[in-house]
């Protein structure tokens, strides 16, 4: 049955009390995906190190019937996994809404943006006010382009503008309660894609993880639950240091203690003598494998003292590598222990993209073909002239007016700089590396795939292409001819440190589905032009709309015809896609004295 997303959009209201974190209910076309944005809390201006980035995100699901994960973080924490393919969970400074897409040829709809927090909106909104409904028959008029740039896009609207958003845009929303611990988080899923965002106002850092799963959702779910937790441990002493240990609660001493088998005996009482392992297996097992929102909440409750500015950038990259190695080892160990009951875990995996922003430093780690791009103004010696892109640029659906110079080159204001490295059989160096590592296997690359299975050459999980014992535990139809002991798929990431300068305007982080239809140059050009014309629009959702428009055009169908194709079947036309646009305009951190 088709999703009917383009025509059947039923109304829903935010009628239940809002806890400290609110899950966006699967209303409207929530199964299609969701958009979200980060809006700093009203109290942030009082902090000396307030976060100044604007974050716009969107996720699109092509798969609706994602199987229930064999590894389920929510169930491990005592919850029940929801049965829909797209969901989003946030703390207070994030707002989220189901995707509401429109055909770009008729003009974009701006249905995502910060929620005003100046009007004492720290609790649930009036349930009588419908915050969602059918798309308007005509798209709203675009905002005036007289004032341009990201600064308008991410400034806080007045309460009157919120009312206009309700009446004119019929926007569904979730307004969680305010949190005061300085840590804000969001995580969501769309098909087999997962996204995890953590903002630490006090520590002046931003963590973004985009995990593009394949052969099942178990690997990306495991990454959301565990990678940030491992990374935070590795960053101790680099990004932060523990405050006075005397202020720790008892359970924090227990969790942070050494993993030995010594008994804890409070002398004289005789009433509390349990081993640390036993405590972790009971009360603290939930902490160890809690859902990803607990990563933000548990660590946010700890007393952390700011560390000095980072000078050893290699130490940060090494911490990222160690955190990934620990997460991978834990996942493969879980897979090994589950082979008797759930051998399917051996084939599940994920491409990975992590961006860590601290002050004016960006650290990127990636496996697979997801990408991180920074849009830069040309330097003084660069005339901004780009050849060979005219034919593709005319497909960008936001009414571009491209200036040309003699010789047929297009002039653009911003250029893309890719911070990640693609790992696939399309990269000649990767193919040569695998063949060098497997000289006795002339079938290591078959049909442009590793062992005829995967297009990517580096990934998280996928144990059947890393360990012979995991491969041999599969049914014969899934088993590879595994020769030797060397992994066919590597978990060695590519790493990058980038120092932000006045040239850098925004970051675009995305899973590979975006680049099925757009090049790096087109992505930057689209976001730049869109935000100049519609400063209050949603650049991430606009990229999703552009992707769908191109997919429909390539398939020879109407935009809404594509949306009405049942999810699962629509996977033939586009992949699950997660996109994040992070503005770098304005001061990065209030305390850093750095302007971009």
Swiss-Prot record:
Binding-site residues for Mn(2+) 1, renumbered to this chain: 212-213
Stored Pfam families: PP2C
Enzyme Commission numbers on file: 3.1.3.16
Keyword Hydrolase: yes
Domain of life where this protein originates: Eukaryota
Binding residues annotated for Mn(2+) 2, in chain numbering: 212, 512, 575
The keyword Protein transport is annotated on this UniProt entry: no
GO biological process assignments: signal transduction
PPM-type phosphatase domain segment(s): 177-584
InterPro entries: PP2C (IPR015655), PPM-type-like_dom_sf (IPR036457), PPM-type_phosphatase-like_dom (IPR001932)
Region Disordered: start-end pairs: 122-154
Cofactor, free-text remark: Binds 2 magnesium or manganese ions per subunit.
Swiss-Prot/TrEMBL catalytic activity: O-phospho-L-seryl-[protein] + H2O = L-seryl-[protein] + phosphate; O-phospho-L-threonyl-[protein] + H2O = L-threonyl-[protein] + phosphate
Cofactor: Mg(2+); Mn(2+)
GO molecular function, one term: protein serine/threonine phosphatase activity
Keywords assigned: Hydrolase, Magnesium, Manganese, Metal-binding, Protein phosphatase
Family note: Belongs to the PP2C family.
Name of the protein in question: Probable protein phosphatase 2C 26
Organism: Oryza sativa subsp. japonica (Rice)
């Amino acid at each position: 049955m088709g999703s009917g997303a383009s025509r059947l959009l039923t109304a829903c209201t935010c009628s239940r009390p809002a806890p400290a974190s609110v899950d966006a209910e699967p209303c409207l076309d929530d199964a299609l995906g969701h958009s979200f944005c980060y809006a700093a809390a009203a109290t942030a201006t009082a902090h000396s190190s307030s976060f100044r980035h604007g974050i716009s995100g969107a996720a699109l699901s092509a798969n609706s019937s994602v199987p229930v994960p064999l590894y389920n973080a929510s169930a491990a924490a005592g919850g029940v996994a929801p049965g829909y393919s797209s969901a989003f969970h946030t703390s207070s400074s994030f707002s989220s809404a189901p995707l509401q897409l429109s055909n770009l040829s008729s003009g974009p709809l701006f249905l995502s943006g910060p929620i005003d927090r100046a009007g004492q909106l720290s609790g649930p909104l009036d349930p009588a006010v419908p915050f969602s409904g059918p798309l308007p028959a005509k798209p709203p008029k675009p905002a005036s382009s007289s004032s341009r740039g990201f600064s308008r896009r991410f400034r806080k609207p007045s309460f009157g503008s919120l009312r206009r958003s309700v009446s004119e845009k019929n926007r569904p929303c979730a307004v969680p309660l305010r949190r005061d611990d300085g840590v804000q988080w969001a995580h969501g899923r769309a098909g087999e894609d997962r996204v995890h965002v953590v903002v630490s106002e006090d520590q002046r850092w931003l963590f973004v993880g985009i995990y593009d799963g394949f052969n099942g959702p178990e690997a990306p779910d495991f990454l959301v639950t565990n990678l940030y937790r491992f990374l935070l441990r590795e960053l101790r002493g680099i990004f932060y240091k523990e405050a006075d240990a005397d202020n720790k609660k008892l359970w924090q001493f227990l969790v942070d203690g050494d993993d030995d088998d010594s008994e804890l005996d409070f002398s004289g009482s005789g009433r509390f003598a349990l081993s640390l392992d036993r405590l972790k297996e009971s009360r603290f097992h939930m902490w160890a494998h809690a859902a990803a929102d607990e990563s933000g909440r548990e660590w946010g409750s700890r007393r952390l003292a700011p560390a000095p500015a980072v000078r050893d950038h290699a130490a940060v990259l090494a911490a990222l590598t160690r955190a990934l190695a620990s997460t991978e080892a834990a996942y493969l160990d879980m897979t090994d222990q589950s082979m008797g009951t759930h051998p399917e875990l051996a084939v599940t995996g994920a491409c990975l993209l992590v961006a860590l922003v601290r002050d004016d430093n960006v650290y990127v780690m990636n496996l697979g073909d997801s990408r991180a791009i920074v849009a830069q103004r040309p330097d003084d010696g660069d005339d901004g002239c780009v050849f060979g892109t005219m034919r593709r640029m005319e497909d960008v659906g936001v009414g571009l007016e491209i200036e040309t110079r003699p010789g047929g080159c297009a002039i653009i204001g911003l250029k893309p700089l890719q911070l990640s490295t693609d790992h696939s059989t399309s990269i000649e160096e990767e193919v040569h590396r695998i063949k060098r590592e497997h000289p006795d296997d002339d079938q290591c690359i078959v049909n442009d795939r590793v062992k005829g299975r995967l297009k990517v050459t580096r990934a998280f999980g996928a144990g059947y292409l890393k360990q012979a014992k995991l491969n041999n535990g599969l049914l014969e139809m899934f088993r590879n001819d595994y020769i030797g002991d060397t992994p066919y798929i590597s978990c060695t990431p590519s790493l990058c440190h980038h120092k932000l300068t006045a040239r850098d305007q925004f970051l675009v982080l995305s899973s590979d589905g975006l680049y099925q239809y757009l090049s790096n140059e087109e992505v930057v050009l689209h976001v730049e032009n869109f935000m100049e014309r519609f400063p209050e629009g949603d650049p991430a959702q606009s990229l999703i709309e552009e992707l769908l428009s191109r997919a429909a055009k390539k398939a020879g169908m109407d935009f809404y015809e594509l949306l009405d194709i049942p999810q699962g079947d629509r996977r033939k036309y586009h992949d699950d896609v997660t996109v994040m646009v992070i503005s770098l305009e304005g001061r990065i951190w209030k305390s850093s004295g750095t302007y971009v």
